Amino acid sequence: MIVAEEHKIAPWKIEEVNNLKKLLKEGQVIALVDMMEVPAVQLQEIRDNIRDLMTLRMSRNTLIKRAIEELAEESNDPKFAKLAECLERGAAIVITDMNPFKLYKTLEDGKAPAPIKAGAIAPSDIVVEAGSTGMPPGPFLGELKGAGLPAVIDKGKIAIKDDTVIVKEGEVVSPKVAVVLSALGIKPTKVGLDLLAAYEDGIVYTSDVLKIDEEEFVQNIQSAFTSAFNLSVNAAIPTTETIETILQKAFTEAKAVSIESAFITDKTVDDILGKAYAQMLSVASEAGEEALDDDLKERVSSTASAVEAKEEEAPKEEKEEEKEEEEEAPAAGLGMLF
């Protein structure tokens, strides 16, 4: 608390710092936002929209810095003091129960389209689409051409002939271009509260850490889960998610070993006998007929006939399919006429 040299420090500043410290103690998540570029009208709309989600408190940067540093010293939390290092431009304090990542997304989603000012850096390629501007011929035609747009007169109105990138990403917007974009109603930028940093549980999160690609993040989580799942199954480390697959894999492998080694169980006896029978017929078919009795000859003959019938049936089916395709072709041709 500020108690010394009160004659040199305005009383309202002392009171403001104390009020800020009291506010900072209330939040689970404490964040700093930059609101320098937000017009008064949009700022009021933002405050109305976030009123139920967070508390926004504006003050001077010097007083916010003093409040953070004093509170960090009083609570013996040097990590909290690092939050003050993120202060810049027109900062304000945000107090909320939302985690920093959700807070960042909420503030980004709350930004509104706005005209871009001269001297600003284009956040992405600024494109003016082809089409009528709805404006009658006049001096504005020259302004459009002066800004580099292919402007023409079409049906008594000024029109843009082709889609045109008027400013590339990273380039500075010139005064001429800024005027033209504003007149055309193009709003290539967004205004809102820019999150500078957020503090939670001893960690200061800067905006670059909080800015994540949600789709990529979900894909990474899914990929990690798949890798962990496969590792658990292949290493036979049972978990709630993998126990069923591990048991199925173990059963399949055990059954294969049992069949291959002719180890009879109630689960493999049919497969083993079937395999032995097939092997017996294979050996019998390789032996001469004089080595077989009548029963075995009949079995070998039946198997051979079944194989031949299957081989003859396959080409027949292929011919029928080809015939159907030939019959469908003229019909399809007629269909093209209607």
Swiss-Prot record:
Residues 292-338 are annotated as: Disordered. GO terms for biological process: cytoplasmic translation; ribosomal large subunit assembly. Pfam families: Ribosomal_L10, RL10P_insert. InterPro entries: Ribosomal_protein_uL10, Ribosomal_uL10, Ribosomal_uL10-like_insert, Ribosomal_uL10-like_insert_sf, Ribosomal_uL10-like_sf, Ribosomal_uL10_arc. SUPFAM superfamilies: Ribosomal protein L10-like. One of its GO terms (molecular function) is structural constituent of ribosome. Keywords: Ribonucleoprotein, Ribosomal protein, RNA-binding, rRNA-binding. Residues 308-318 have a biased composition (Basic and acidic residues). Residues 319-329 have a biased composition (Acidic residues). One of its GO terms (cellular component) is cytosolic large ribosomal subunit. Signal peptide: none annotated. Gene3D superfamilies: 3.30.70.1730, 3.90.105.20, 6.10.140.760. Forms part of the ribosomal stalk, playing a central role in the interaction of the ribosome with GTP-bound translation factors. Belongs to the universal ribosomal protein uL10 family. Part of the 50S ribosomal subunit. Forms part of the ribosomal stalk which helps the ribosome interact with GTP-bound translation factors. Forms a heptameric L10(L12)2(L12)2(L12)2 complex, where L10 forms an elongated spine to which the L12 dimers bind in a sequential fashion. This is Large ribosomal subunit protein uL10. It comes from Methanococcus aeolicus (strain ATCC BAA-1280 / DSM 17508 / OCM 812 / Nankai-3). The gene is rpl10.
